[in-house]
Structures are given as C-alpha cells and as structure tokens.
C-alpha cells in the first residue's frame, strides 16, 4: 500500500482514513518512509516558509469549565496565577515586543467558557487600539462565540479565530463534561460565517488512541479550518491528567506526519508541550509537516525564548513569512 499512497501524494491528494490507519501502524524504518512522504508534501505546500504567531494570556484562571488537562480550571488546585482582563496598555506593550522580533501575528487568549459582555466590549476596544498602533495580523481566542460577537471581532480588525476541538468527538467526554463538543463546532462555524479564518487543533497524548488522533484530523478537515495547532499534553500537578504518560517522540513525529498527509494544504502549527515532549528533537517536526509555530510563552507554561527559536528556525534554512 505504500506505493499506492506515494502515487496519491504525488497528485496532491490527501490520504483516506483507511490509508492513514494503515500508516499509523508503521514502526522503525517504515516511519522513515512516512517522514519522507510528509516532507515531500510539506515542501510542496510551504516552500520553506514558516508562519509565526505569539499569544498573550489576557485573562487568567478562574475558568468555570472542567477540562482535565487545564491548570486554569476552578475544579483543580494547581496554583495557577489568576487575574482579570489586562488593560490595553499592557497588551499593546506585549504586542509591540512581538512585532519588534519580526513576528507578524498576535493573539489575545482569555480564560473561561466565554467572556462577559463587559469584558467582550473591552476586548473590542483593545483590538481597535492594536489595529491602529501595530501592523500585526490579529487573532482571538475567547472561548465559545456566536455570530454576533464574531462579526464584531471581524469589524475590530481580527482576522483569525482560534478555538481548539481539543480531541476527537469520541474522546471528548473523557476530558470535559461542562460543555459539549458540538458547542465547540458551533463556535467554529459562527466564526467562519463572519468571515474569520479558523485556527483549530487539539492536544495529543491525553490518553486517546492513535485512531482517535486520526479522527480529530478528519473532523478538522471536514470543518475546513485554515490552521491546525498540534499541542502535546504537558501534565500539570493538580489536574486529573497530572500522571498521564506522554507519547514517545517517535509517535509524536508520526502523528505530525499523518496530519500532514491528511491535511496537505493546511498550516500545521507547533503549539504547547513541544519543549517538554520533544526537546531538541522538535527540529524533526518541520520536515514531518510543521510550517507554523506559536513562539514564546503559552498560557500557564513557558516556551522557548523567542530569539533562540528564531535562530533554530533560520539555521534550518526556513524563511519567516
């Protein structure tokens, strides 16, 4: 079946679920074949260009939801830093620092199921300031969203809405019971209806099977998202997943390869947990399919220093787009 899949890849097609399931069983030398196929697709799509974005944790902690991986949930004692919505001065300062580093995309991320009307109105004002005082492409990750709010974000200058599915629908109730998978899907569709691009992916190594990872990839494909962040669980003390065993580096790279073969023309973005799970092996993620990176710190965990990561990316002959 390898040769048949290779022919399909040459024609620019994504692979089927059955083909992905077959490749997912590969071990050792066969993984190198999968990596080679994924590298070919990545080269054709990305042309050695890397899209970089950075985020600011604009409102932290006190989240009403019970996502079992999250340090910000009120259900778990994690010692997470808690603070209300940052003001426009603090956020503009963070945005300017990002822009000075040559990063062109910036997102506000807020904790909670969604924002109160008061906080949402304030966020709209903040985006208006960012649009006037920076040249950054603006993204938002504000929880559940309806079409009315999506249209307001679009008008304020936001181009992309981020809202992860987190995992396959068949696994979702294992990690969250306070809202439904369909509410997440509805948020994505609301943002799309307002003309926003969609950044949506998930977290791997939550305890799901490889087939459920593939299920997530095909659900994202069906939704027509534009960018897929791939996060690896970083177990947080105090959460129910604190003792969860993390996948091997080999399985993480194989998963990235399969996502690239399933989603040949969608940006695959390194998200959180990469530093802890892959370390220096993260460089293998780029030929495997990664053509975008969330750079800098995350919500409650630290990433690689921006200057160091930029140096690594450039040393691989990749161009920042």
Swiss-Prot record:
Reaction(s) the record says it catalyses: (4R,5S)-dethiobiotin + (sulfur carrier)-SH + 2 reduced [2Fe-2S]-[ferredoxin] + 2 S-adenosyl-L-methionine = (sulfur carrier)-H + biotin + 2 5'-deoxyadenosine + 2 L-methionine + 2 oxidized [2Fe-2S]-[ferredoxin]
Cofactor details (free text): Binds 1 [4Fe-4S] cluster. The cluster is coordinated with 3 cysteines and an exchangeable S-adenosyl-L-methionine. Binds 1 [2Fe-2S] cluster. The cluster is coordinated with 3 cysteines and 1 arginine.
Cofactor field: [4Fe-4S] cluster; [2Fe-2S] cluster
Domain of life of the organism encoding this protein: Bacteria
EC number: 2.8.1.6
Entries under CDD domains matching the protein: Radical_SAM
Keywords annotated in UniProt: 2Fe-2S, 4Fe-4S, Biotin biosynthesis, Iron, Iron-sulfur, Metal-binding, S-adenosyl-L-methionine, Transferase
Gene3D superfamilies: Aldolase class I (3.20.20.70)
Single GO term (MF): biotin synthase activity
GO BP of this protein: biotin biosynthetic process
Residues the entry annotates as binding [4Fe-4S] cluster: 63, 67, 70
Amino-acid positions noted as binding [2Fe-2S] cluster in the UniProt annotation, renumbered to this chain: 139, 199, 269
Pfam families for this protein: BATS, Radical_SAM
Oligomer status and interactors: Homodimer.
Listed PANTHER family: BIOTIN SYNTHASE, BIOTIN SYNTHASE, MITOCHONDRIAL
Similarity remark: Belongs to the radical SAM superfamily. Biotin synthase family.
Identification of the protein by name: Biotin synthase
Organism in which the protein naturally occurs: Desulforamulus reducens (strain ATCC BAA-1160 / DSM 100696 / MI-1)
Gene behind this protein: bioB
């Amino acid at each position: 079946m390898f040769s048949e899949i290779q022919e399909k890849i040459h024609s620019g097609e994504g692979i089927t679920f059955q083909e992905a399931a077959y490749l997912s069983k590969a071990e050792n030398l066969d993984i190198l074949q999968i990596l080679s196929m994924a590298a070919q697709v990545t080269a054709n799509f990305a042309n050695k260009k890397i899209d970089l974005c950075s985020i600011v944790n604009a409102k932290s902690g006190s989240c009403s939801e019970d996502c079992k991986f999250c340090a910000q949930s009120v259900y778990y004692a994690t010692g997470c830093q808690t603070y209300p919505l940052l003001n426009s001065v603090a956020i503009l300062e963070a945005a300017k620092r990002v822009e000075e580093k040559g990063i062109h995309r910036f997102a506000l991320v807020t904790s909670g199921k969604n924002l109160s009307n008061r906080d949402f109105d304030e966020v709209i004002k903040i985006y208006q300031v960012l649009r006037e005082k920076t040249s950054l492409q603006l993204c938002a990750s504000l929880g559940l969203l309806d079409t009315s709010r999506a249209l307001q974000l679009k008008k304020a200058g936001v181009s992309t809405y981020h809202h992860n599915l987190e995992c396959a629908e068949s696994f979702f109730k294992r990690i969250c019971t306070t809202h439904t998978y369909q509410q997440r899907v509805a948020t994505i569709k609301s943002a799309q209806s307002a003309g926003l691009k969609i950044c949506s992916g998930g977290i791997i190594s939550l305890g799901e099977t490889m087939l459920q990872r593939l299920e997530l990839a095909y659900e994202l494909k069906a939704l027509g998202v534009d960018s897929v962040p791939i996060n690896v669980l970083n177990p947080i003390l105090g959460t129910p997943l604190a003792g969860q065993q993390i996948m091997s580096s080999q399985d993480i790279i194989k998963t990235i390869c399969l996502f690239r073969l399933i989603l040949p023309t969608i940006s695959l973005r390194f998200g959180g947990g990469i530093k802890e799970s892959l370390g220096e092996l993260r460089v293998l993620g780029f030929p495997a399919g990664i053509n975008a990176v969330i750079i800098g710190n995350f919500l409650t965990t630290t990433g690689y220093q921006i200057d160091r990561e930029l140096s690594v990316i450039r040393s691989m002959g990749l161009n920042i787009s």
